[in-house]
C-alpha cells in the first residue's frame, strides 16, 4: 500500500514537472556556488570557477597554519609590503585589482585583524593600516574586550540581562586560541547556497505531499476508501509513511548531490577551521567548525522541512483539500517578515520554524533564552523542540484522518 501511495504522488504531471524544476534549480545553485569563488591573476583579471578556486587555494596555502602572534605579524609585514608596491588608489579600478591580487591569499586573516581592532558594531576596511606588529598579537584578547565594552554600553541595557551578558562573555572566552587557518572556500560557498536549496526542497515537497490525504475526496472515492476493511487504519498509515518517505528521500538526495558537486569541485579542505576565522562569523558565540556548521545547517534544514510538511499534511487531512495545505510552508517563511516589527514577538520569532532553514545566517545573531535559570541560544532549543513536535504530529495526523466522517 505504501508503494501504491508513492506511485500516486508521482503519477501526477505537476509532480513530475516540479521535480524537473527542482533538479534545474539544483544545477543553477551548484553553478552559482562553484562560480562564487573569485581569483585575480597578476594582470588584475578576475576568474571564477574550478580553476580559479584551485589557484586561490594555492595562494592561501602559504598562510596555512596556526594564527599565533608570529603569523599575524607576518601578515602585517606582507600587507605593508603590498601597500608600498601596489597602493590603493581612489577611483583606479585596475590598480586596486592588482592590490587585491596580492592580498587575496591572506584576505580572510586581514579581515580578522580589521574586525578585531574595530568597535564591536563597526567595521573599518583600512583598520589594519594602523595596527602595529606588537598590537596585532592581542587580536583574540581584543575580540573579548570589544564584546565586553559593547555589553557595558547603554545600547545593550534593554537587550540583555546580566546572566545573558555573562553567558556571551563566557562563550567568547571558551573559544580556543590561537585559531588554525587553511582554505575553507568550498565549505563557505556550499553554506552560502545551502539555505536556497533547503527552501526549494521544502516548497516543492509541499506540493507533492499536500495531495496525499485529499486525493480520495477530489476523486470522489472517499466513501469507498473509508468503507474498505483496511482503509481507515492501514490505508491512513500507508499515506502517512509514504509522505515521510517522499520528503526524506527527496531532501537527502538533493542535499547529497549538492554537497558532492560543490565540495567535489571546490575542495573538502578547511572543514576543521573554526567559523570565527574570517569575516562572516567572527562575532558568533557558537564555537564550531565549518564542517560542523554545514552539518548543522542541513540537519536543521531537514528538521524544519519535515515539521512544516507534517503540519501541511495535518491541514490537508483535516480540510480534505490540498489548496490550503500548500500555503502552510509559504506562510511559515513569509509570516516572520510581517511580524518582525512587533518587538514583543521577538522571542517567539527567534525560534520560529523558518529559523531552522537559515541556520548559517542566524548563527551570528545573539538570540538568547533562559530555561530553568540556564541561558541557551536559540539553535539548541529548536533542535530539541521541533523533532519532538514532528513526532507528536504523526499520531495527530493519523487520528485526524482515521476518524474522518463520510457525509
What residue spans do the PLM features occupy?
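Aromatic- and glycine-rich beta-strand/loop motifs that create alpha-glucan
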Residues: 1-16, 22
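Alpha-helical transmembrane segments of multi-pass membrane transporters/translocases
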Residues: 11, 15-18, 304-312, 367-407
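Membrane-helix interface segments
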Residues: 14, 231-232, 321-326
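Residue-level recognition of pore/gate-forming positions within transmembrane alpha-helices
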Residues: 22-26, 242-243, 330-334, 390
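Secretory targeting signals
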Residues: 24-81, 136-216, 237-318, 338, ...
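Transmembrane helix segments
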Residues: 31-32, 319-352
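Transmembrane helix boundary and interhelical loop/hinge segments in multi-pass membrane proteins
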Residues: 209-224, 228, 232
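Short hydrophobic, aromatic-rich alpha-helical segments embedded in or entering the lipid bilayer
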Residues: 347-368
Amino acid at each position: 500500500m505504501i508503494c501504491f501511495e508513492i506511485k500516486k504522488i508521482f503519477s501526477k504531471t505537476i509532480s513530475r514537472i516540479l521535480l524537473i524544476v527542482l533538479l534545474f534549480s539544483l544545477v543553477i545553485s551548484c553553478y552559482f556556488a562553484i562560480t562564487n569563488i573569485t581569483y585575480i591573476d597578476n594582470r588584475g583579471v578576475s576568474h571564477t570557477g574550478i580553476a580559479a578556486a584551485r589557484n586561490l587555494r594555492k595562494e592561501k596555502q602559504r598562510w596555512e597554519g596556526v594564527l599565533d602572534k608570529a603569523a599575524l605579524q607576518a601578515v602585517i609585514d606582507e600587507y605593508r609590503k603590498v601597500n608600498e608596491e601596489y597602493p590603493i588608489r581612489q577611483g583606479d579600478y585596475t590598480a586596486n585589482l592588482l592590490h587585491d591580487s596580492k592580498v587575496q591569499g591572506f584576505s580572510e586573516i586581514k579581515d580578522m585583524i580589521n574586525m578585531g581592532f574595530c568597535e564591536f558594531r563597526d567595521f573599518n576596511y583600512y583598520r589594519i593600516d594602523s595596527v602595529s606588529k606588537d598590537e596585532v598579537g592581542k587580536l583574540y584578547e581584543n575580540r573579548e574586550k570589544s564584546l565586553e565594552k559593547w555589553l557595558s554600553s547603554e545600547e545593550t541595557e534593554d537587550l540583555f540581562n546580566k546572566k545573558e551578558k555573562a553567558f556571551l562573555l563566557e562563550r567568547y572566552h571558551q573559544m580556543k586560541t590561537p585559531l588554525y587557518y587553511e582554505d575553507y572556500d568550498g565549505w563557505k560557498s556550499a553554506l552560502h547556497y545551502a539555505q536556497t536549496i533547503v527552501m526549494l526542497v521544502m516548497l516543492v515537497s509541499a506540493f507533492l505531499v499536500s495531495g496525499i490525504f485529499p486525493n480520495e475526496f477530489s476523486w470522489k472515492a472517499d466513501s469507498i476508501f473509508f468503507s474498505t476493511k483496511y482503509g481507515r487504519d492501514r490505508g491512513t498509515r500507508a499515506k502517512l509513511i509514504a509522505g515521510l518517505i517522499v520528503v526524506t528521500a527527496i531532501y537527502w538526495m538533493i542535499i547529497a548531490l549538492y554537497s558532492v558537486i560543490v565540495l567535489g569541485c571546490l575542495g573538502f579542505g578547511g572543514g576543521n577551521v573554526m567559523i570565527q576565522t574570517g569575516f562572516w562569523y567572527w562575532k558568533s558565540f557558537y564555537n564550531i567548525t565549518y564542517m560542523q556548521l554545514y552539518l548543522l545547517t542541513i540537519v536543521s534544514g531537514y528538521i524544519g522541512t519535515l515539521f512544516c510538511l507534517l503540519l501541511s499534511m495535518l491541514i490537508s487531512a483535516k480540510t480534505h483539500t490540498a489548496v490550503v495545505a500548500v500555503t502552510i510552508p509559504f506562510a511559515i517563511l513569509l509570516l516572520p517578515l510581517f511580524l518582525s516589527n512587533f518587538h514583543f514577538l521577538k522571542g517567539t520569532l527567534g525560534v520560529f520554524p523558518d529559523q531552522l532553514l537559515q541556520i548559517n545566517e542566524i548563527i551570528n545573531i545573539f538570540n538568547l533564552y533562559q530555561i530553568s535559570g540556564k541561558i541557551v541560544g536559540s539553535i539548541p532549543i529548536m533542535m530539541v523542540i521541533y523533532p519532538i513536535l514532528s513526532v507528536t504530529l504523526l499520531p495527530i495526523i493519523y487520528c485526524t484522518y482515521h476518524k474522518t466522517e463520510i457525509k
